[in-house]
């Protein structure tokens, strides 16, 4: 189920894999244009951000490949398509800034987390650069070293 964090924020889904696979450069908060059954399914926490990414087409930001499970209590006729493209609600100046940065080689937009903020569904989008294999190994090594140090401190 979703967990609470901070004032008026309820985290629905967290994309931990994105933090491992990418160097996060900047983050942006964006609203998402959703259908009714999508919101109901999100309230149940049935969202997967792992394979998701964002694109900018015709000066509009789009969230692609994010899986929101169909709402169980709605019939098939009224339900939404699980992996449809969803429009991100950003200010024009933010979109212009992102267009310039995404055109640089190797930068992409990935969703980091989805949450409710005062009843509205929000997504944290990160401008990110892909990590190389040796960067990932270094991250794992640092995490293991930190864990070993914490264990040693706890014993004393």
Curated annotation (Swiss-Prot):
Task: Drop me one GO molecular function for this one.
Answer: RNA binding
Name the major location. cytoplasm
Query: Among the entry's GO cellular component annotations, what is one?
Result: cytosol
Q: What does this protein do?
A: Required for rescue of stalled ribosomes mediated by trans-translation. Binds to transfer-messenger RNA (tmRNA), required for stable association of tmRNA with ribosomes. tmRNA and SmpB together mimic tRNA shape, replacing the anticodon stem-loop with SmpB. tmRNA is encoded by the ssrA gene; the 2 termini fold to resemble tRNA(Ala) and it encodes a 'tag peptide', a short internal open reading frame. During trans-translation Ala-aminoacylated tmRNA acts like a tRNA, entering the A-site of stalled ribosomes, displacing the stalled mRNA.
Which organism is this entry from? Trichodesmium erythraeum (strain IMS101)
Name of the protein in its database record? SsrA-binding protein
Record CDD domains: SmpB
State the superkingdom: Bacteria
Q: Which NCBIfam families match?
A: PRK05422.1, smpB
What's in the keyword line of the UniProt record? Answer: Cytoplasm, RNA-binding
Question: What is the similarity comment for this entry?
Answer: Belongs to the SmpB family.
Its GO biological process annotations read: trans-translation
The record ties this protein, via HAMAP family, to: SmpB
Lineage of this protein's species? Bacteria, Bacillati, Cyanobacteriota, Cyanophyceae, Oscillatoriophycideae
> One Pfam family for this entry, by name?
SmpB
The record's subcellular location field reads: Cytoplasm
RNA-binding found in the keyword field: yes
* InterPro entries reported for this sequence: SmpB, SsrA-bd_prot, SsrA-bd_prot_CS
């Amino acid at each position: 189920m979703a967990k609470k964090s901070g004032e008026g924020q309820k985290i629905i889904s967290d994309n931990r894999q994105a933090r491992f696979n990418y160097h996060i450069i900047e983050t942006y908060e964006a609203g998402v244009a959703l259908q009714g059954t999508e919101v109901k399914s999100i309230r149940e926490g049935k969202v997967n951000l792992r394979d998701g990414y964002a694109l900018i087409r015709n000066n509009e930001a789009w969230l692609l490949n994010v899986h929101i499970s169909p709402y169980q209590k709605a019939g098939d006729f009224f339900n939404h398509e699980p992996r449809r493209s969803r429009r991100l609600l950003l200010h024009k100046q933010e979109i212009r800034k992102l267009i310039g940065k995404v055109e640089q080689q190797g930068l992409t937009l990935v969703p980091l987390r989805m949450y409710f903020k005062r009843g509205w569904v929000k997504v944290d989008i990160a401008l990110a650069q892909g990590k190389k294999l040796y960067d990932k190994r270094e991250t794992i090594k640092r995490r293991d070293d930190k864990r070993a140090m914490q264990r040693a401190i706890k014993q004393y």
